[in-house]
């Protein structure tokens, strides 16, 4: 079984970023906006900061207390959004319930919205319009498949998960690549058959080791987007990776797979935002 490691893909994106940086007259700056001290958010923030800085890009974190009022956060976010020195924004979600997240999604400048959360960018993804930004994780899936020369045209692809972060947008991106896409979720009847009939499975349900080799057709490709913690406190995906050998032709590990590419896509989007200016 071929291990689809994200480092190779990330290195390819880094090359693109380095070349494009040379053509710019300034260093693009990413604003990471975080509310509260959620360990997952903080971990992602550290990883993204480290990756983008290693790519030669500028990163600034804007951290607000968990109990910030809706009004105060709207004002602070407006200032970041309108700051000419900020090239792109990554808003770590979900926000506390006291903050109107929909309002913020509508407020963010689509040209700075690097993770594709604004209604305009979401509409572009669903329309097959590549002039906007798609969610980084969804795009990372496509980057992995392309980097390893995995053909998508005409292929049967099953996507497990229907979130606006991964499931729905990745389905649209796969359709744009001429794949034949089946969208499923945890309530799909006979999920096992739908997955095992596919040539490529994208697992994005958010349930630890939910899919084992029974969900994998012979020589299928398994792309695991899940980031979970197993019963031993170890990081794992939605796919039970250890069961795949002898069944899958290729699979992404967790950690070291799609997640590694997600932050590289964020860097690529920052460069693209800089070029739009």
Located regions from the model:
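Positively charged, low-complexity intrinsically disordered leader regions
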Residues: 1-26
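Short beta-strand segments enriched in small/hydrophobic residues
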Residues: 27-37
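Glycine-rich phosphate/diphosphate-binding loop of Rossmann-like nucleotide-binding domains
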Residues: 35-49, 132-221, 230, 234-245
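Short beta-strand elements in bilobed, periplasmic/extracellular small-molecule ligand-binding domains
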Residues: 52-66, 181-183
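Short, well-structured alpha-helical segments in soluble
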Residues: 72-84
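Anion-binding alpha/beta catalytic cores of soluble intermediary-metabolism enzymes, centered on
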Residues: 88-152
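Short, well-ordered coil/turn residues at beta-beta hairpins
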Residues: 92, 204-205, 224-225
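Rossmann-fold NAD(P)-binding glycine/threonine-rich loop
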Residues: 102-123, 223-277
């Amino acid at each position: 079984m071929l291990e689809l490691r994200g480092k190779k893909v990330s290195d390819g994106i880094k090359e693109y970023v380095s070349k494009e940086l040379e053509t710019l007259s300034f260093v693009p700056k990413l604003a990471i906006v975080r509310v509260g001290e959620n360990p997952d958010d903080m971990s992602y923030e550290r990883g993204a900061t480290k990756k983008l800085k290693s790519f030669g890009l500028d990163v600034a974190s804007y951290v607000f207390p968990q109990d910030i009022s809706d009004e105060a956060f709207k004002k602070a976010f407006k200032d970041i959004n309108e700051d000419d020195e900020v090239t792109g924004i990554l808003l770590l979600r979900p926000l506390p319930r006291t903050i109107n997240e929909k309002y913020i999604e509508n407020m963010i400048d689509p040209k700075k919205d690097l993770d594709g959360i604004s209604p305009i960018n979401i509409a572009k993804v669903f329309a097959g319009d590549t002039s906007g930004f798609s969610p980084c994780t969804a795009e990372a899936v496509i980057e992995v498949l392309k980097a390893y020369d995995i053909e998508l045209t005409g292929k049967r692809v099953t996507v497990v998960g229907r979130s606006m972060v991964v499931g729905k947008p990745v389905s649209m991106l796969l359709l744009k690549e001429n794949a034949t896409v089946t969208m499923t979720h945890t309530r799909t009847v006979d999920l096992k058959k739908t997955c095992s009939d596919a040539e490529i499975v994208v697992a994005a349900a958010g349930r630890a080791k939910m899919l084992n080799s029974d969900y994998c057709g012979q020589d299928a490709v398994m792309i695991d987007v899940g980031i979970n913690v197993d019963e031993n406190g170890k990081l794992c995906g939605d796919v039970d990776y250890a069961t795949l050998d002898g069944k899958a032709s290729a699979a992404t590990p967790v950690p070291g797979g799609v997640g590694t590419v997600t932050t590289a896509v964020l860097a690529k989007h920052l460069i693209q935002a800089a070029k739009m200016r």
